[in-house]
Amino acid sequence: DEVIGGKKVKRKHEPGAVEKATMWGPAVAIARSTVEEKLGKVPLSPYLALDLIAAAKSGSKEAAFRREDDAIEELIASDQFRASIYAFNLVQKHAKKPSGAPDKALARKVSKVGVLGAGLMASQFALLFLRRLEVPVVITDVSQERIDKGIEYITSELDKLVEKGRLSQDNRNRYVGNLSGSLDYAAFADCDWVIEAVFEELKIKQEVFAKIEEVVSEECILATNTSSLSVDAMAKSLKHPGRLVGFHFFNPVAVMPLVEVVRAEKSSDEAVATAMEVATNLRKTAVITSDSAGFVVNRLLGYLLGEAMRAVDEGASFEEVASAIAPLGLPMNPFDLLELVGLKVGAHVLDSMHAFNKERFYASENLHKLAEHGKLLERDAKGKIKSYDKKAMEIVAGGKNARSAAEIFESVQVGLAKEVKLMLEEKVVQTPQDIDLCMIMGAAWPFHLGGITPYLDRSGASEKAFGGSFHEPMIIGVRD
C-alpha cells in the first residue's frame, strides 16, 4: 500500500552504492541467462523487463517511468501482444464452444469407469477418473501382478497428495474404496465408460474391445487412447461400432489439458457427446477431430520431429538443428522432446506418419538405432541436460549433405504450413482455431506466438506454402 501510495519504503536488504556498482550488472546478466535457458530468445516481454531493471541502476525516477512507458508502448504495438490476446480468447472462449460438438443432452451418464490396462498411462487414467468423476473405477491387465502394481501406483499417488496437504485422508480412503482390479472382464459388466490403454498395436486393441463388448451393455461407450492407430479400423471388430470414440490424452495425464476426441466414421452422436462431457468433467479441453493419422498434435509434431531427424541424417549436428529450429519458440527442442516421450515411441510415431504419407513424412533409421542405444542426452547428477550423448552422435554421424540453418528452418516452416492447410481441407478439424487450440494445449505452443496458424502467417510461411494466409486480416501488431 505504501508503494502504491508513493511513499518510500525502507527495505531490509536494499543494496547500497557499492552493491549497485559491482553487483547490479552481474545479477541482471544471471537473470537474463536464466530466462534464455527456460524461455529461449523469442519472448519479448521478459527481456524488456530485464532491460528496465538494468537501466534502473542509475538516473531519475522520472526517466525510469518514461522508459517503462516506452516499453509498454512497444509491447502493446507488438505482434506478440496481439497473438497473446488471440491465444487467450482461444483458451477462454473458443474452447468452451467446441466446433462440431453434438447436443450435450445426448451424453450418457457415467456412473462407473473401466480401464483396460494397468501400466503407467492406464494407471494415470484411473487416478484421474477417481478424483475428477468420483465414481467406481475397475482396471484389468494380462496378469494379477500387473493389476496389483497398477493399484499400488494409484494408491501411492493418492498418499503423496495427502502428504502434501492436497487431499484429505477421508477422500483418499473413499477413492481407494472406489478402486478395484480384476482379471475377469465380468467386473466391467456395469461400466458406462470403458477406455483402453493397452499396447499400441491394432490387433491387440481389436481383441480387447471385442472381448469387453461381450460383457458390457449396449449403452456402454468404448474409448481408445490411441495416438496413431485408426479408430475406424478398431471399430471393425465391434458388433456396435457406433459406441467407439477416440479419447487421446497427452502425457503427463494430470498436467496436460488437452484431449483429442476422435469421431470415427461410425461414431454415434451419443458416443461423441459422452466423450465431450467426460472431458469436461475431467477438467480437460476437448477438441473434436476426424479419424486421420496422428489427429492434430502428433501429425504436426511428427512432421517437425521427422524434419529434425532428416536434417541430422543429412549431416547437421543435433546442436545445429536445435539452434535452427529455436525461433519457433517451442518449450523444448525436437531432441529433448524425443527423449522425453521415449526414443522408441518417437520412432514409432515417425514410422506411423511415414506409412500414412511417404512423401511428406520422414522416417529415420538412425532414430531406431538411437532407440536401441537408449540414450540421446547427457545429464549431470541432478538430471540437468549437459550435452548430447557421445555414442548418439557417433550413431548419426556420416551425413554428407548438411543444409544451412536458414534452409532447415524455412523447410520446417513451409512444410508445417502445407500440412495445416491439408488438415483443414481434409476436415480433420473445422477451423484454424481448432488447430491452434490443440497446439497450445497439447504441445505447449507458446501463448505469445498465438498458436501455429497466426505464426505461420506472420512468418510468411503460409504465403510460400499456398499463396495465402490462414487468417484475414492477419493477427499482427501495429505497423508503421
Regions found by a protein language model. Give the residues of each.
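N-terminal glycine-rich phosphate-binding loop for ADP-containing cofactors
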Residues: 1-480
